[in-house]
Amino acid sequence: MKTVVLCFILFFHNPNSLEDLITSLEIRSSEEISNYFDSNSKIIINEKVSKGNKFQLTKTLDNFFTENNLREFKIIHKGDSQNNIIYMLAEYSSNDDIYKVFLTLLKDEKKYIIQKFKIDIRE
């Protein structure tokens, strides 16, 4: 019976859900976040733009997470707009700084794709 329930949960669980993305952002898992990238995704950290394949974008996030002693991720606001675009405003905080985070995602069929992932230090 346990096997049937587990199979049922795994079958209906969407591995590309908005909740999973938020969890990945909270735990700073670049590898999990990369599941939401495609060839058009871009990351902007303090005005420096990074584009490329998933590996390059993942490396950019890894570097940011490694260089900054982040403690907390907090969502400020999220919503949707026209054409299946979802946006999220959030903050990462460290011992010394607060980073503003802005994400735009495209909901394409049953998958979310990060279009833009922007991080700026709050002054």
What kind of feature is each model-predicted range?
Residues 31, 50, 74-82, 120-123:
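Exposed acidic/polar residues on beta-strands and adjacent loops within beta-sheet cores, strongest
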Residues 98-123:
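Short beta-strand edge/turn micro-motifs at domain boundaries
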Residues 37, 47-49, 77-79, 91-94, ...:
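A mature extracytoplasmic/lumenal domain signature
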Residues 14-29, 36:
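Short, aromatic-enriched amphipathic alpha-helices that serve as compact interaction elements
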Residues 20, 32, 56-60:
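Alpha-helical elements of Rossmann-like donor-binding domains used by nucleotide-donor carbohydrate transfer enzymes
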Residues 1-21:
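Bacterial Sec-dependent N-terminal signal peptides
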Residues 59-97:
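Surface-exposed, charged secondary-structure patches
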Residues 37-74:
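Short solvent-exposed beta->alpha transition segments
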